[in-house]
Amino acid sequence: MGNCFTKTYEIPITSGTMRRPASTAERSKARGGDEPGTWRRPSFPRHGAPPHRPPTGSSSAAGALSRRASGGGGEMGPVLQRAMVSVRSLYQLDRKLGSGQFGTTYLCTERATGNRYACKSVSKRKLVRRTDVDDVRREITILQHLSGQPNIAEFRGAYEDNDHVHLVMEFCSGGELFDRITAKGSYSERQAAAVCRDILTVVHVCHFMGVIHRDLKPENFLLASADDDAPLKAIDFGLSVFIEEGKVYKDIVGSAYYVAPEVLQRNYGKEADIWSAGVILYILLCGTPPFWAETEKGIFDAILVNQVDFSTSPWPSISESAKDLIRQMLHRDPQKRITASQALEHRWLKEGGASDRPIDSAVLSRMKQFKAMNKLKQLALKVIAENLSPEEIKGLKQMFNNMDTDRSGTITVEELKVGLTKLGSRISEAEVQKLMEAVDVDKSGSIDYSEFLTAMINKHKLEKEEDLLRAFQHFDKDNSGYITRDELEQAMAEYGMGDEANIKQVLDEVDKDKDGRIDYEEFVEMMRKGIQT
């Protein structure tokens, strides 16, 4: 199918009976006919009140900026809480890729570039409850947060019009991992190790960045292209949530074959994702799930009490190392279950040939971008970061804590290097030091939480013009509608950046009409230019 929003061919978690998946052939047949698929309800965090719009001052220039920030008087969308936009003005919607309960996914073409993407159009009529809207917001927030990770389908943007909310994502032309499995029947150990490594990398990155996926299964991994060695891309974060310290999750979600025992017991955390990944690995190696029955209740009972079968064919011919990893991933006690980070170091995955492909994680990519920014842009991002709501920075606190291993409240050079290495980035000590110097705006020798937030702002946080307006007005002290040279020098002097060279660099880069000052249009262009993730 190739789109980044697949149909969900699962057994609903609450009712109904199901067929035993005795073989991959049976599963392929069941999947390939007219069996109805259901769309996952899109999901995201509770937003609360509409965004606050800052006072704009009395000048006509400031008033014009305020009108621009409110979308030029355009109607605000109730779901995304920003000015509504016609997605068809930006993208041409082409053939339908799939449809379901909440909407339809189309192949689409960006009018400005000709690039192809997948667009999921969610009907607002189906978002009847407040929780439905909250779910959509949470999914978008999580997709934005994970933007830039190599094994996660890239999120392009969300748009709202009168009838729909549209989510535009990377188009993955290679189809589903599920279809690749059913076509092959089973994988060689080396092939399975490569796939498992990609899946565990996704799990590790999600957990490191403060997200639990909660619906890992082969259908939710697409291949970037039809090539045999095409990378996997994780999709469908509609059931995902941000990790909250100390919170125990109780709602039963997921897909029957892949759900962890503690989920059925309504007492679980991020370890449930490891169980689901272990089930996928088991299927990769033998073609059938480790726990099955004729009914959903039977499957759940098997998950809770049955032992994993390693005695029937083909398991006697599969290496003990592979079986050891599966046992550790399918340990019934989540506290004794292997973590994603530990699993990636398991000897079976190492024996399978660890990938030597260099990875730029979203964290490293964003820090590199921050380092390359001019000083005004760095300070403007700091203003925006300080005004983001708790909902907008969910996940970032978990990322910061995962790097701040000694819980000092700051990230040292060594902690930064270790954290980037854990995310798969290969980086020299010299480059780490340069990143540290760029992100450490107050030159304290370490990165505090505010500085970390500033560097981690992704491109999607620059979509709301009220945030850009607030940042502009922070520097435009006299509400003239311009940032003058004196105002620029004053702002930069607070952080020891007010030397002539830095000021000249900013004006040369940003002041397009060369009038010696920066207007709002020039400021917005600077802020949105060059941020890729």
Curated annotation (Swiss-Prot):
Organs and tissues of expression: Expressed in roots, leaf blades and developing seeds. Expressed in vascular tissues of roots and leaf blades. Expressed in the phloem tissue of the large vascular bundle in leaf blades.
Positions of the catalytic residues: 215 (proton acceptor)
Residue intervals of the EF-hand domain: 391-426, 427-462, 463-498, 499-533
Region (Disordered): 1-77
Cysteine pairings via disulfide bonds: none
Molecular function as annotated in GO: ATP binding; calcium ion binding; calcium-dependent protein serine/threonine kinase activity; calcium/calmodulin-dependent protein kinase activity; calmodulin binding; protein serine kinase activity
Lipidation (N-myristoyl glycine): 2
Residues reported to bind ATP: 97-105, 120
Broad EC category: transferase
GO biological processes: defense response to fungus; intracellular signal transduction; positive regulation of response to salt stress
UniProt biased composition (Basic and acidic residues): 26-38
CDD domains: STKc_CAMK
InterPro entries: CDPK_Ser/Thr_kinases, EF-hand-dom_pair, EF_Hand_1_Ca_BS, EF_hand_dom, Kinase-like_dom_sf, Prot_kinase_dom, Protein_kinase_ATP_BS, Ser/Thr_kinase_AS
UniProt keyword terms in alphabetical order: ATP-binding, Calcium, Kinase, Lipoprotein, Membrane, Metal-binding, Myristate, Nucleotide-binding, Repeat, Serine/threonine-protein kinase, Stress response, Transferase
Residue positions binding Ca(2+) 4: 511, 513, 515, 517, 522
PANTHER family linked to this entry: SERINE/THREONINE-PROTEIN KINASE (PTHR24349)
Functional description taken from the UniProt entry: May play a role in signal transduction pathways that involve calcium as a second messenger. Functions in signal transduction pathways that positively regulate responses to low-nitrogen. Functions in multiple signaling pathways, positively regulating salt tolerance and negatively modulating rice blast fungus resistance. May promote tolerance to salt stress by negatively regulating NADPH oxidase and positively regulating reactive oxygen species (ROS) scavengers.
This protein's domain notes: There are 3 contiguous domains conserved in the CDPK subfamily: a kinase domain, an autoinhibitory (junction) domain and a calmodulin-like domain. The autoinhibitory domain (354-384) inactivates kinase activity under calcium-free conditions.
Protein known as: Calcium-dependent protein kinase 12
Organism the protein comes from: Oryza sativa subsp. japonica (Rice)
Name of the coding gene: CPK12
